Amino acid sequence: MVGSRSASHQKTVKIVPMTNRADKLPKSWDPQAVEKDLYEGWVEKGYFTADPSSSKPAFSIVLPPPNVTGQLHMGHALDHTLMDGIARRKRMQGYEVLWLPGMDHAGIATQTKVEAMLKETEGKSRWDYSREEFIEHVWEWKRKFGGTIGTQMRAIGDSVDWSRERFTLDEGLSRAVQTIFKQMYDRGMIYQANRLVNWSPILETAVSDIEVVYKDVEGELVSIRYGSLNDDEPHVIVATTRVETMLGDVAVAVHPDDERYADLVGTTLPHPFLPDRQMIVVADDYVDPEFGTGAVKITPAHDPNDYALGLRHNLDMPNIMDATGHIAGTGTQFDGMDRFEARVKIREALAEQGRIVKEVRPYVHSVGHSERSGEPIEPRLSLQWWVKVEKLATMAGDAIREGDTVIHPKSSEPRYFDWVDDMHDWCISRQLWWGHRIPIWYGPEDAEGNRDIVCVGPDEQPPAGYEQDPDVLDTWFSSALWPFSTMGWPDKTPELDKFYPTSVLVTAYDILFFWVARMMMFGTLAGETTPEILGQGTDGRPQIPFNDLFLHGLVRDEQGRKMSKSLGNGIDPMDWVERFGADALRFTLARGANPGVDLPVGEDSAQSSRNFATKLFNATKFALMNGAEVGTLPERSELTDADRWILDRLEEVRVSVDDYFDRYQFAKGNEALYQFAWGEFCDWYLEIAKVQIPRDMEAASAQEQARGRNTQIVLGQVLDALLRMLHPAMPFVTEVLWKALTDGESLNVAEWPTAAMTNGGVATDEVAARRMADVEKLVTEIRRFRSDQGVKPSQKVPGAVDFAAADLAAQEDLVRSLARLDQPAEDFAASASIEVRLSQATIEISVDTSGTVDKEAERKRLDKDLAAATKELETTAKKLGNESFLAKAPEAVVAKIRERQQIAQEEVARISARLEELK
């Protein structure tokens, strides 16, 4: 018998009639039937509400604010799953957790959406309204439609503190924006200047780099001859994809070492359409002499590289377009034309002059487009407000270099330093109406046309008669204040005292520069200017906004491609919630989330996670039906090898999971839980429990009763700890199962597992571990052997095994039960045998299958299996032979296909051998 003890040590177990805890569970797991009510109950009980007066250690996260216009996409779902997992675990570990939610006003995105709505419903543009009227329309839209993301966050189980939800245009956050703007303006860190920006002619505003999407387009490459049309006289040939910009050309650049143009450097060439403009030939290392003709036209007001060269050579920078992308102010016949119409007309006019040397069509090249309005972006010289970033970037870089904030994974540090160490001044003004209006006021013009400029703080009033700057701030300006403005800065608040700096920021690596670096810049600045509010940093350095920075990868499709509308491969996370449940969505993402590594997902992944939730449900229900409960563990000496093994494995998993989660290795931690839950607890220990728990406790012997009762306690112990550890990733199914198992209040207020909750903190029983590893191998090999012999899984056959030789005498009944082997009779005659190498010996297993196998039926079955295995082998070989696929597919996908190929090869060999035996 398993774990048998001598009669002198047997105890009488009192059998107490128990209510069946499994009755507390529904018939089957249906996420849709329970998730919404569970979540609302958690919120009502205040489980997620943070208490700044608590004596518990603090842990805080701010939610990267999604756009008020948006809906949750897979990237959001990954973000939220990881943050929620962190927050839930920290609560269980005894921390006072603040997970602070909120939304971004999303200046351009929201304004364009409302403009489109007004155009459709009222046939009007924003210019048909006063600024105040239009803004009121936006607020009305926000009140009607801005709650979508909040509803979706509830659906996936976000344990945020809804009582502290913030919006970037809230009064308190607006006060923070004005405060830091004035601090920076007064320090000379904000200034106004004419510089090159990304300009959207449709939106009529500057846009940030992140709002520019690059697409390959079929255009034209036109070569233009500047200078004399006589080959014997000075001339150069330049090529451009934007012929219209030649109206802004002020120079031609060549490389200093290019002897072809050495005599031309410093001379001028007449502009074809502007007789008063002479274009100087300049020498600059920017030019590649090997590319094209080695000469480049220079349009400083409409190209970033030309702008930089223009600054170096002190060139004029004439702006040839107005805010709508029409040619303006050139004094030519092209004024008033749209830029694309002008492109054609100017090319035709140049051709008439004989200046078109060559035209290439189509010419495919990458062009930046406005993410919001879709048209090609126009680089344009524009008067804007700018942040002088030099000092801010230095502080943001030093915070990482000094270890005040730690980036996970460390491999992302070089990208961060590349950005902050080579950062250009930041354009913060936008020509919009929706957003934080720039707190700059202009006085009346004096006799010389000059105006007094005043920066007004949140508690100040502008002088009478002054007019406010019409522009608003870049959305990233206010979101850069998010970690501390949401807690009340610039006022001193209990929230800042308790929860700042925040513990960790969780976000995707693709906004490391656009958002994260700017939060570091503004966070360290606020730490430097208001240490009495935000606290002192380390070693005299400014306080930082977060201690850890966890950068996860991007969610991609199963082939590793970016999800996009054009590819039609996008996945709506809410569709998965409806079809598979929130836990399945969350576990799919959590199980694949490695720091800094992209995550390929597909429907198969979600179905697998849904199956896992069902497996947990069925396993718990089975355990409860068999009397599993949480209680005091018996003495180790009273447990079977299987009991000790599963408890020790539980402790090993707990230790590794804690280590993984502490290092933000969520994929490894959740994979460890999955493999333990399914591969060890469900597949093995539950099957063992069926053997160890008597079918009829009252009729069983005292020894069998004791063993069965111990098994019930071990079942409860393992399930209790396992459900607790899975709760951060799968909060709904674990809550239902844990409450049925323990009668506890909620996992939201339960303790995170410790060694005392697993194996009692004792050393691992290596002998029990060895024996159970041998049991698993032996049972697996016998099952495979039976299958190869054509024996049905449910059919018992007599078998002879030398258990004692393998030190498995105490496990004989267990192995025979799991492997469906009867004791051999006296007249036993083996029809087949195999050898299995175990840790202590190589033993022979002999079975008698005579009369149990229909050879003809077995041949047909094997032929069918062989055909399937051969097809799988051909399919995988074809994929692995496709060089294009191998170059594009993620390593994990290729590795999975190689594994499938290996399994198929083994199956073909095994089945072929068995067919040969049946001949």
UniProtKB/Swiss-Prot annotation:
Sequence motif 'KMSKS' region, location on chain: 562-566
Gene that produces this protein: valS
Top-level taxonomy: Bacteria, Bacillati, Actinomycetota, Actinomycetes, Mycobacteriales
One Pfam family from the record: Anticodon_1
Subcellular location: Cytoplasm
Recorded family membership: Belongs to the class-I aminoacyl-tRNA synthetase family. ValS type 1 subfamily.
Coiled coil region boundaries: 852-919
Motif ('HIGH' region): 66-76
Known catalytic reactions: tRNA(Val) + L-valine + ATP = L-valyl-tRNA(Val) + AMP + diphosphate
Residues binding ATP: K565
Protein's recorded name: Valine--tRNA ligase
